[in-house]
Amino acid sequence: MRISKYKQVASAIFYLSILFNSQIASATVTLPLRTKKAMVVSANPLGSEAGLEMLRKKGNAVDAAVATTFAISVVEPFSAGIGGGGFLLMHSAQTGEMKALDFRERAPLKATKNMYLDAQGKVRPNVSINGYLAVATPGTVAGLYELHRRYGKLPWQEVVKPAIALANNGFILSQQPTWRSLPVYEQRKQAILANPAARAIFTRNGEFYQPGERLIQRDLGKTLTAIAKNPQDFYTGNIARAIASDMAKNNGLITLEDLKSYKPIWRTPVCGNFRSSKICSMPPPSSGGVHLLQILNIIGDTDLKSLGWHHPDALHLMTEAMKIAYADRSVYLGDPDFVKVPVQQLISPAYAKIRRGQITMDRAKPSIEVKPGEIGRGGE
C-alpha cells in the first residue's frame, strides 16, 4: 500500500480539524425523550444510526459510542473528525465506576510559546485558527481504540464498518446547520477553497455540494479501512507517514515522532454535590467540569424553579456565576501535566459562598470588572 494513497485525505483531515469550532444553535425547544432500553444521541441521525446498529448486534454502549464517533467524522467532518481529539466520561451501571479519558490533541514537539506572534510580539491574525500551524497531534483514533480495547464487546472492525460505508457509498447532505451554512461564511469558504485536498472533496469544480446532493469521500474510506485493520497505522504506518510528509511540505509542525509518541490518558473525574445529586464531569485539562461544579455551587440552594421560566433574577444569578467561573478559568485552569490546578479550592462550597457574596442582584457587573478569586495559587 503506497503512501500516496493517503496524501489527499491526510491534508484534508488536518485542514478540517481546525475549521468550524462552533455550530449555529437552534432555538427549538422539545420535550425530553425517554426509553427503557437504550438510546444513542449525536449531532447527525446517520451517526446515531451507526451506534444503534451496534446495539442491535448485541454490542454494548462503548461499541455504540465508538461507531457513532467514527460515523460523525464522515457526516459532520467540520465539527468532529479523526484529525481531532476529545474528552470522554464513562459510567458503569453495574459497578458504579466513573472513568474519564483524555484524548485531546497534543502540541507538537516543535511548537513554541510565541509561534502565533509576529516579530513585534503582536498576534498573527487567524494563524491559530486556520492553516497547518493551527493543527496539533490528533488523538481521536488512539482514544477510541483505547476505549474499545478495554471495554468494547464487538470486534474493532465491526464498529468502524458503518463509517467506512458512509464514506465509500456517500450520504445525502441534510439541512443540518453545518452543511447549510458552509457556503455562507466567507472566511471558512475561502479557507476550504484554498486547500487543494479540501476543495477536491467538498466542492464540484469550486462549487460547494448542497443539501440534497450526495457526498462521497473515497479517500477517507480508504483511510478508515486501514484504521479498521490496524489503528496504529494512523500513528506509525502509511497514514502517519503521509501526515508527516504533508506537514513538512506546508510548514506544519507535526512529525512522525509526535504521532508515534501520542498516548491517551485515563484521568480521575472531578465530582461534587449539588443538592441531593452527585455531579461528575471531565477534569482538567478540560475546564468544563470544574466550572460546572463551581457555577452550581454559587447557585447553591436558590430555588430557581419557584422564580419561573426565564425569570430575570434567575438569569441574572446564572450569568453572574458564569462570569465568575470564567474569570477564575483565565488564571487557574490549565493542563495538569504541566501546571498545578487548584481543583478542590475552586469546587469547594466555602469558596463558592465567598464568590456568591460578590454578586449584586440589582446590578449586572461588566465582565471586565469580574476578577479571579484569591485562592492558593499554584497548587491544591
Specify the residue positions occupied by each region the protein language model found.
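Bacterial N-terminal signal peptides that target proteins for export
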Residues: 1-13
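Bacterial N-terminal signal peptides
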Residues: 11-22
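Short helix-capping/linker segments at secondary-structure and domain boundaries
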Residues: 149-154, 231-233, 299-306, 329-333
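M16/insulysin-pitrilysin zinc metalloprotease superfamily fold
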Residues: 193, 289-305
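Internal maturation/activation junctions in enzymes
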Residues: 302-380
